[in-house]
Swiss-Prot record:
GO CC term, one of those recorded: host cell nucleus
Official protein name in the record: Replication protein E1
Modification type Phosphoserine: residues: 80, 95
Cross-link Glycyl lysine isopeptide (Lys-Gly) (interchain with G-Cter in SUMO) placement: 521
Subunit structure: Can form hexamers. Interacts with E2 protein; this interaction increases E1 DNA binding specificity. Interacts with host DNA polymerase subunit POLA2. Interacts with host single stranded DNA-binding protein RPA1. Interacts with host TOP1; this interaction stimulates the enzymatic activity of TOP1.
Organism: Human papillomavirus type 1
Length: 612
């Protein structure tokens, strides 16, 4: 039999023969002697084991994961250092210069930053999906790895810088609401500026929190218009609210982030355009939608521009006479106060609302102030001094203590009887008794005493520092009493030369600005000075024209800084009421003022529903 080619079976035969011999030598009795019980005592290790530093291992794993996420978010370079191949890493470790040497042509094209991809507008993916859904983390990690390795595709860049987040939110808002956020709101540059009404758009709000937001906002607001806008690619909370107190943007965002678990960068907050008809119609139409939650009374600026009855009221033209009547009744003669306080009335007065809508506000304010001054000047001219004082006292509310005035005069060692006689002659305007001088050392209360009296009587102040102007005496034409505070030697020289008739109480000619010189009877004049005019012979012609009293002692103050003598309007009112007869002021019943007088001037016709 021929051997098989390529095979040799000698070794196998020998091995089989050895195995047979071994089995024959082994007897069955020996197999019975083999113990079938195994020793398992060392199988379980019951020795105490050390746990090891598992916290350190967990910390390393967390750090590595955070570093990987951070590298995935880098946008400035498309290729992260961790994306290099092993060969590139070896070359860079050998020499940095070798890395720049390459046979193939390098592509020097710079990739531009892709702000918006086709499928994503730039916001985080978490804002596009419901937070209650389960998200496969491995898929997100794979996608981020593709981005930081240079693969710029449909995924795009999901995180924008802070300056671009607002642009992305505005774009999302316009796509969903159908109108631009800036068309509904006016921009506040400062976060500290306060407003009562706010328009809010909040992204990232869970749907199960909407009902709780409605309840929580009612404790802070008087009006709420809320809608949870949901589309395929967008979801946000849209609100128009009026708070119980005015709040700044900083306070509003802090309140929203306290109520809702959202980030402040995903909140748009601006005050609404309260004078835009289009914006008012937008809010009015939304309030009637079934998907919008509305709580509270409709805001007045929405009702005024949408409801028919309010539209008819707002169409009434502006009437200057109503504005003049308001300024006259409230005693406003300064243009700045008239403009400000009348603008405040726009919410409740239709004529003030028409004033704000006018393009000639400055002209109306100027004309109003001028007309009020004309009326008040004519009214003051026809009043006697007694009637004028009675009217000023009637404007003071409350009662005081006349003894405070008397104590102060006695403290300054002023004879009370002599002072009352001079004060009576001053108010009556007797010739040669038309000027009352209070002189003495500094800090004795001269100016305080005279200015408190001038404030009660509604007088005017003239200053010698304006004597270079020929109009410096013009305030005396509109006053029942005047004050020249702190007269010095040049002032007394001027009065000795030019103002002797004024000190006599005679008729003088005063040059008025933008008007012809006017002849008036000089009103009673109070003067304070540190100079005793009657003791100086150089002003001997003024001695008979001035009644002088000296304040010798320094004005006292209490430990807490309050004045030792209270020279208030209430105390002066009590003083005049107590010494009305001694000052020879006429009885108001004799002048026809039996009780409070009726309104002396009415510029507008009485309304049909106004009581007589």
């Amino acid at each position: 039999m021929a051997d098989n080619k390529g095979t040799e079976n000698d070794w196998f035969l020998v091995e089989a023969t050895d195995c047979e011999e071994t089995l024959e030598e082994t007897s069955l009795g020996d197999l019975d002697n083999v113990s079938c019980v195994s020793d398992l005592s060392d199988l379980l290790d019951e020795a105490p084991q050390s746990q090891g530093n598992s916290l350190e291992l967990f910390h390393k794993q967390e750090s590595l994961e955070s570093e990987q996420e951070l590298n995935a978010l880098k946008r400035k370079l498309l290729y992260s250092p961790q994306a290099r191949s092993a060969d590139e890493t070896d070359i860079a470790s050998i020499s940095p210069r070798l890395e720049t040497i390459s046979i193939t042509k390098q592509d020097k094209k710079r990739y531009r930053r892709q702000l918006f991809s086709q499928d994503d507008s730039g916001l985080e993916l978490s804002l596009l999906q419901d937070e209650t859904e389960n998200i496969d983390e491995s898929t997100q990690v794979d996608q981020q790895q593709k981005e930081h390795t240079g693969e710029v595709g449909a995924a795009g860049v999901n995180i924008l810088k802070a300056s671009n987040i607002r642009a992305a939110l505005l774009s999302r808002f316009k796509d969903t609401a159908g109108v631009s956020f800036t068309d509904l709101t006016r921009s506040y540059k400062s976060n500290k500026t306060c407003c009562g009404d706010w328009v809010l758009a909040v992204w990232g709000v869970r749907e199960n929190l909407i009902d709780s937001v409605k309840e929580l906002l009612q404790t802070h607001c008087v009006y709420i218009q809320l809608e949870h806008a949901v589309t395929e690619k967008n979801r946000f909370l849209f609100l128009l609210v009026r708070f119980k107190a005015q709040k700044s943007r900083e306070t509003v965002i802090k309140l929203i982030t306290t109520i809702l678990p959202v980030d402040a960068s995903y909140i748009l907050s601006e005050p609404p355009k309260s004078r835009s008809v289009a914006a008012a119609l937008f809010w009015y139409k939304r309030s009637m939608s079934s998907t919008v939650f509305t709580w509270g009374t409709t805001l007045e600026w929405i009702a005024q521009q949408t409801l028919i009855n309010h539209q008819l009221d707002s169409e009434s033209p502006f009437e200057l006479c109503k504005m003049v009547q308001w300024a006259y009744d409230n005693g406003h003669t300064e243009e700045c106060k008239i403009a400000y306080y009348y603008a405040v009335l726009a919410d409740e007065d239709e004529n003030a609302r028409a004033f704000l809508s006018s393009n000639s506000q400055a002209k109306y304010v100027k004309d109003c102030a001028q007309m009020v001054r004309h009326y008040l000047r004519a009214e003051m001219a026809q009043m006697s001094m007694s009637e004028w004082i009675f009217r000023k006292l009637d404007n003071v509310e409350g009662s005081g203590n006349w003894k405070e005035i008397v104590r102060f005069l006695r403290f300054q060692e002023v004879e009370f009887i002599s002072f009352m006689i001079a004060f009576k002659d001053l108010l009556c305007g007797k010739p040669k008794k038309n000027c009352l001088l209070i002189f003495g050392p500094p800090n004795t209360g001269k100016s305080m005493f005279c200015t408190s009296l001038l404030k009660l009587l509604g007088g005017k102040v003239i200053s010698y520092c304006n004597s270079k102007s020929q109009f410096w005496l013009q305030p005396l034409a509109d006053a029942k009493i005047g004050l020249l505070d702190d007269a010095t030697k040049p002032c007394w020289d001027y009065m000795d030369i030019y103002m002797r008739n004024a000190l006599d109480g005679n008729t003088i000619c005063i040059d008025l600005k933008h008007r012809a010189p006017q002849q008036i009877k000089c009103p009673p004049l109070l003067i304070t000075s540190n100079i005793d005019v009657k003791s100086d012979t150089c002003w001997m012609y003024l001695h008979s024209r001035i009644s002088a009293f000296k304040f010798a002692h320094e004005f006292p103050f209490k430990d807490n800084g309050d004045p030792g003598f209270s020279l208030t309007d209430e105390n002066w009112k009590s003083f005049f009421e107590r010494f009305w007869q001694q000052l020879e002021l006429s009885d108001q019943e004799d002048e026809g003022n039996d009780g409070k007088p009726q309104q002396s001037l009415r510029l507008t016709a009485r309304a049909a529903n106004e009581p007589i």
